[in-house]
C-alpha cells in the first residue's frame, strides 16, 4: 500500500486497471464508473515479496517457538488478500508444517475481524502476521490497549534473518521533546 499511486478526479468517468506483459499480452479491468469527483488508488505486491514475508514470519515463529496467526480480508479483497492467504498456506504446507508440529506450535489463518476479537481477548504469546498497513494500525492499537505506544518496539526481519529494531511510529521524537521540557513521559 505504501508504494501505491493515488489520483483525485473531478469529473464523471471510468477508471481502468491495465497490465501490459513483456510478452505483449494485455489485461484490462474496469475499476469503477463514477458520476462525479472521486479518489483512486492503485497498489501491487510481487509474489516474491509476499513469499519472503511468509518465510520470515514462519521462521520467526519457529525461532521463538510461538504460534503464528495470519489474517487478512480475503472475503472482500478476494484476489489481493487471497493471494497472501494462498502463499502463506502453500509455504506452511510445503516448508514449515513439520517443524511447527515438532515444536508443538500452530499456524492458522483467520479473517482480520475475527483475529481482532481473538487478540483482544487473548493473553498474547503468539505472533500475529499482518500486511503492512494492517500491521501498522493493529500494532498501535494493541500497544496502546495493553501498555503504551512509547514502550513498543518494531522488529523488521528479512528472509535471510537480518533483523532491524526501531522505535514505534513517532514516539521517540514526541517523548524526547517532553523530556526536554521536564514533562513526564510514559
Language model features with spans:
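Structural motif
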Residues: 1, 15-17, 67-69, 105-108, ...
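A glycine- and small-aliphatic-rich helix-loop capping segment at beta-alpha/alpha-beta transitions
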Residues: 3-12, 84-91, 145-155
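Solvent-exposed alpha-helices and their adjacent loops that cap or buttress functional pockets
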Residues: 9, 32, 61-62, 98-102, ...
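N-terminal glycine-rich phosphate/adenylate-binding segment common to multiple enzyme folds
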Residues: 1-26, 133-137
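Glycine-rich phosphate/diphosphate-binding loop of Rossmann-like nucleotide-binding domains
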Residues: 17-23, 27-110
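Glycine-rich phosphate/nucleotide-binding loop
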Residues: 119-186
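Active-site loops and adjacent core secondary-structure elements that bind or stabilize anionic groups
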Residues: 113
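Short acidic, glycine/serine/threonine-rich loops at helix termini
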Residues: 2-5, 79-84, 119-122, 139-143
Amino acid at each position: 500500500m505504501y508504494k501505491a499511486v493515488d489520483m483525485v478526479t473531478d469529473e464523471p468517468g471510468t477508471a481502468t486497471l491495465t497490465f501490459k506483459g513483456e510478452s505483449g499480452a494485455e489485461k484490462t479491468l474496469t475499476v469503477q464508473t463514477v458520476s462525479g469527483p472521486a479518489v483512486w488508488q492503485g497498489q501491487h505486491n510481487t509474489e516474491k515479496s509476499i513469499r519472503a514475508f511468509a518465510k520470515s514470519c514462519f521462521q520467526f515463529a519457529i525461532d521463538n517457538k510461538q504460534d503464528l496467526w495470519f489474517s487478512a480480508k480475503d472475503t472482500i479483497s478476494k484476489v489481493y488478500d487471497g493471494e497472501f492467504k494462498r502463499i502463506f498456506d502453500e509455504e506452511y504446507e510445503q516448508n514449515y508444517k513439520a517443524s511447527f508440529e515438532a515444536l508443538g506450535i500452530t499456524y492458522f489463518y483467520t479473517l482480520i475481524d475475527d483475529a481482532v476479537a481473538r487478540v483482544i481477548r487473548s493473553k498474547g504469546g503468539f505472533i500475529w502476521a499482518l500486511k503492512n498497513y494492517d500491521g501498522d494500525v493493529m500494532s498501535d492499537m494493541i500497544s496502546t490497549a495493553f501498555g503504551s505506544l512509547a514502550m513498543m518496539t518494531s522488529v523488521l526481519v528479512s528472509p535471510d534473518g537480518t533483523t532491524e529494531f526501531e522505535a514505534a511510529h513517532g514516539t521517540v521524537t514526541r517523548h524526547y521533546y517532553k523530556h526536554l521540557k521536564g514533562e513526564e513521559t510514559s
